[in-house]
Amino acid sequence: MTALQTILMESQGLLPMLESFDREALLAVNGSDSLFLDRVAHVLTTAITWIPLYISLFIVVLRNNDNFRKVMMILGAAAMCVLLAGTVDDLIVKPTVARWRPTHDPVIGAMVDVVDGYRGGRYGFFSAHAANTFSIAIFFCWLVRSRLLSTAMVIWSLTNCWTRLYLGVHFPGDILVGLTWGFLVGTFVYFLFYRLTRNMTSGRRLISSQYTSTGYQRKDCDIPVVILVFTLIFTLIKSCIL
C-alpha cells in the first residue's frame, strides 16, 4: 500500500468522524425552551437590525476622510468584502459542495429545533453570515486600528454566528470555515485598498492620544460601539416585551 493510498484511507475515515462531531456540536447549542432566546436570535440574525450600525460606520468614515474619492473607495472595499465573502459562497461554493443545512439534513433534520418555521435554503456550507460579517469586521479592524472598535466589530460578527447556530441553519464547521474565509477576504481587501490609496493623505496634523495610528479620531470610534450596545439592549428589551 502506497503512502498516498494510506492517506486517502485515513481521510475517508476522518471525514465521517468530523461530520458526526459537527452534528453533535450543533445539537448541543441549537435552540432552547426559551421563547425569549428564540426572539433574540431571530431579531439579531436579520440584516435590517444592523442598519444603524452600518450607518454609524459610514459616519466614522465620512468624518475622518477629507478626500471624497477615498470615502468612495472605502465603500467600494466594503462592498467587495461582501461580494467576495458572501456572494461567492452563495453562488459558487454552496451549490458546488451541496452540504445540507442542519434543518434539511436527512440524518438530524427532525431533531433540529426550528424557530418560527425558519429553515433557510437547502445548502449551508459555508456560512455567508459568518463570512460577510467577519470580512467587514476585519476590514474595519485594519482600517481604523482602534482596539475598542475592533473588539466591538468582532463581537458583532460572533453574535451573528451564534444566531445561525441557535437557529440551526449552520453546523459549527460551516461557521468556522466562514470565519476563516471572511478573515482572508477582509485582510486581502484592506491591503488592496491600502495599496491603491496610500498616497491619498488627509493633510491633518495628528495627535497620538486623540487619533489611531491610521488617523481616525478615537472619540468617533465610540459611535459604532455605542450603537452596537444600544442595538443589543434594545433587542433584549423588545424580546422580553413581545
Q: What positions do the PLM features span?
A:
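Hydrophobic alpha-helical transmembrane segments
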Residues: 44-60, 76, 129-132, 152
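Interfacial segments of alpha-helical transmembrane regions
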Residues: 59-89, 149
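Membrane helix-loop-helix hairpins that form the core translocation module of multi-pass transporters
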Residues: 76-102, 176, 181
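Hydrophobic core of alpha-helical transmembrane segments in multi-pass integral membrane proteins
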Residues: 53-61, 79-83, 223-238
